[in-house]
Amino acid sequence: LFHLSYIQRWLKWGFLGICFEEKYGGLGLDKVTQCILAEELGKTCAGIAKGVAAHVDLGSLPIAKFGTEAQKEKYLVPSIAGEMIGALAITEPNAGTDARSIKTNAVKDGDSWILNGTKTWCSNGVTCNYVIVAAYTNKEDKKNGISIFIVDKDLPGFEVSRKIHKLGHRSSDVAELVFENCKLPADALLGEEE
């Protein structure tokens, strides 16, 4: 499985923050530089390169682009430092990658959100500390209606239901995740409610 211990030199050199702002611990470089380094890592182990890319581009980048300062301090800074691993969960068993066909939903409950649904093929799903989750907040709105949440893995109602075994890239874990009445704080919303 992808684990941060495999890339200790990358952590030491700050490579998990190549394209992130220096004020969050990043190096402030461009995506081309990040891609070159990912390509070089992929020459030795494509699975680990995939895990790193999932963490940086799918788990951390949405927070850098759309997160509040508090979310950036809580998730982005430790993700760049290698203290947390992030993941992204959009794909679902009966929807594939068609985001409009997802069933996962989040319903407001006072100052909280109640998240229910199943996600699959989630890279870093086993080893992550948090997941960026797409869920319907307004099923009636066919144009928008999907909001994004940062979900801590240790919340009650969040379960890694299974690790998906695959033929290649075995060092990159892929999982199915289940959210059953998972109560999220109001500040779990990433960006604006759709």
What are these regions (language model features)?
Residues 28-38, 98-102, 178, 184:
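Structural signature of FAD isoalloxazine-binding scaffolds in flavoprotein oxidoreductases
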Residues 12-83, 123-130:
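Internal helix-loop-helix
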Residues 14, 38-42, 135, 151-156, ...:
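Short Ser/Thr-interspersed hydrophobic loop/turn segments at strand-loop and sheet-helix junctions
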Residues 33, 153-164, 173-194:
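A glycine-rich, basic-preceded beta-loop-alpha segment at the flavin cofactor/substrate interface
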Residues 82-90:
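A short, Trp-centered hydrophobic/proline-enriched beta-strand micro-motif
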Residues 104-107:
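A structural signal for short hydrophobic beta-strand segments in well-ordered beta-sheet cores
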Residues 112, 116-160:
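A short core secondary-structure module
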Residues 79, 94-97, 121-124, 137-140, ...:
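Short Gly/Pro-enriched turn/cap motifs at secondary-structure boundaries
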